[in-house]
Amino acid sequence: MTNPKVHFVVSLAINDGKLAQFQSVAQEMIAGTVKEAGALGYEWFLSADRKRCRLVETYVDPDAVLAHMSGPVVRNLVPKMLETASLSSFEVYGDPGAEAGKTLAGIGAEIFPFWHGLKG
């Protein structure tokens, strides 16, 4: 059984005094990602103390992952985001493809290939 979807779970620690800037950049990232045909989900979750964030991303297939990673959101806005928060962990669920997989591994993402489950 295969599943072409790829999911990211990105954990961020928001820098002290940077919440408003963090939220502003997140809004820009959402506005850019919504324009990507292969993006199925791009959801942000804040902890109760508003110091930690989880970003859950879902892409239709590895080509959509590569398009996102080489697109303007990642190129232009991720550097701005990293001025407001530090990356705590980055997990990838599914096969991101060879090129994107190499880039993701290079930034410390842990990749979990699809093993088994419901299709869809």
For each predicted feature, which ranges?
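Active-site-flanking beta-strand signature of metal-NTP-handling nucleotidyl enzymes
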Residues: 6-12
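A short beta-turn/loop motif at secondary-structure boundaries
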Residues: 45-50, 82-84
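Short beta-strand/turn micro-motifs at beta-sheet edges
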Residues: 1, 42-45
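Short amphipathic alpha-helical/adjacent loop interface patches that line ligand
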Residues: 26
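Basic/polar N-terminal segments that are highly enriched at the extreme N-terminus
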Residues: 1-4, 117-120
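An amphipathic, aromatic/His-enriched active-site/gating alpha helix that lines ligand/cofactor pockets
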Residues: 34-40, 58-117
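Short, surface-exposed ligand-recognition loops at beta-strand->loop->(often short) alpha-helix junctions
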Residues: 13-23
